[in-house]
UniProtKB/Swiss-Prot annotation:
Gene Ontology molecular function: translation release factor activity, codon specific
Organism of origin: Mycoplasma mycoides subsp. mycoides SC (strain CCUG 32753 / NCTC 10114 / PG1)
Family per similarity comment: Belongs to the prokaryotic/mitochondrial release factor family.
Gene from which the chain derives: prfA
Function summary: Peptide chain release factor 1 directs the termination of translation in response to the peptide chain termination codons UAG and UAA.
Gene3D superfamilies given in the database record: 3.30.160.20, 3.30.70.1660, 6.10.140.1950
The protein's name in its UniProt record: Peptide chain release factor 1
PANTHER family the UniProt entry points to: LD18447P (PTHR43804:SF7)
PTM section of the record: Methylated by PrmC. Methylation increases the termination efficiency of RF1.
Amino acid sequence: MNAKTYEALETMQKRLLQILKDLEDENILKDIKKFTELNKEKSNLEEVVEKFVEYKKAVEHIKDAKAILENEKDQELIELAKIELDENNDKVEHLQQVIEEMLLPKDPNDDKNVIVEIRGAAGGDEANIFAGDLLRMYKLYAETQNWKINILEASVGEAGGYSQVVFMIKGDRVYSKLKFESGAHRVQRVPKTEAKGRIQTSTATVAVLPEMSEVEIEIRSNDLRIDTYRASGAGGQHVNTTDSAVRITHLPTGIVVTSQDGRSQHDNKDIAMTMLRTKVYEAEVEKQQAQADATRKNAVGTGARSEKIRTYNYPQNRVTDHRVGLTLNKLDQVMEGNIDEFIIALINEEQRQKVAEQLEKNNE
């Protein structure tokens, strides 16, 4: 392990000890924001510091074993020292690799729940139908992960599917797996309404955003205009007779969110505020990305809605992810929620890129 890395790990270990001490401070316990920040930092440090402590112990065992081999005459003790030396050399090599991977930059949002928005884009009715197919695909994938999914807002398409659907997925490390789904999903297939059997290309866009808490995204009440109105149901069914639907406008950004599917006006306001925090976060991220150097563009994609990320070719039962060049000839299985192969490939590509960037920095 190089000296810079070792020094950084020593600093992390000291920082963790300081955080543990601070978390016992009464003033910090009263400050929810500070308490939350420290707990988050503690969680980020604990695992790597634990591995570093293991690494240092293994290094000490190597020193002890070498000392025995240099000074001991007893053959039995020498044999035991050789075994210990081999075991701890392997351990040090393994721990060094694990620690270096842990030290790669992490996405602070990876542990978060997500809000997903799917829109039917180019292709009219067929795009809306495909948006519905994507929603079903994500629902099925969520089931395999034991995640919970909840529709927040939906505009049903005239021929089926959705012109727009917004839903939340809650569970373990949802954003870390679904963040790469953001972008334009292109479908090539023969629409059911196409009498001549011609293949049509349509597009649905997906935006995957981390759920943001009130602590992370602070929105002032005087920056909001809140309107209430009567909720409308499909075909006039189950329409509320009270003004339970909520529309919130964020005046500084002009962002508008609505919710009408909650059980009460209070529920709808909570849902709308959750969506608003996420939308404000998205606007801030887009602003930062626009200001960033274009040459530093992420290899696995920008996450922009307009970026074509995947093509679903129904006649050939083929799906291609254009960011990693992965093609699977089992579209039928993918649409049943079997998207892990794409997710794993994209995570690996992100990891590979981070390692390359870190090596570049080390050589500077």
